[in-house]
Amino acid sequence: MEQITRSSLLIQKMVTGAPVVNLFKQWNIVCEQIPFPKTETKDLPTHDYSSKNGEDAYIPSFIPIKAYDLAISFYYTGDLDSCYTNIFKGFIAYLQGTPPVNDNYDSITEGGFRIYDRHNMIGRQKVYLKSFDPENLVHISGDSIQFKLTFRVSDPSTDIVLTDPNVKVTL
């Protein structure tokens, strides 16, 4: 049985036929920390009467969950001067997607991606890159960089599972 490690993060663009990408196999990127997402419900309509204790709240039978930010810590190590090509021109460019070629909204496909953490067995869809924070870039007999990415999870409740392609894929 294959050992599942913290590096077992899979990503798939939300485009029909897009390949599943294993970050370690594709770009030699290891996930150092993937926290469990904080679950917070949406605010309910309330009215706070000054003459009464507490508040008057409408509590429905189903309380929806808010979208949330997910900050993941990564580590990359590779050949000398490979960081720019693999991280910035490779991985980050993959997450950003490609700009539309024109303003014809019928030709623009949905952006974002699916993400699956095999260690915690949590998968979400409609995820997009929110910020990139490089922490340490070291050039000693190769490149090493620690960085954090913050993702926005706009669909906090749909569970998805992605299967590891076990190989580097063509993007």
Q: Where do the language-model regions lie?
A:
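Extracellular/virion structural assembly segments
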Residues: M1-L171
